[in-house]
Regions:
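N-terminal acidic leader/helix
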Residues: 1-27
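Short, intrinsically disordered low-complexity segments
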Residues: 33-56
Length: 56
């Protein structure tokens, strides 16, 4: 089993990168807690910037 998380940080949402990374990781945590095994990652501005998933 493998957990993969990848997102692009080349936009204005990452001017304060640490805060945006924490926000994204909390969002991933919330989805894992409700049983999700994958999702698209969006930045604070609504742009699709990546994906995470659990693979067998």
């Amino acid at each position: 089993m493998e957990f993969k998380l990848n997102f692009n940080m080349d936009n204005a949402a990452f001017d304060f990168a640490e805060g945006e990374i924490v926000r994204i990781l909390r969002q991933v945590e919330e989805r894992l807690n409700v049983g999700r095994d994958s999702a698209t990652i969006m930045d604070i501005n609504g742009n699709v910037i990546g994906h995470w998933e659990i693979e067998d």
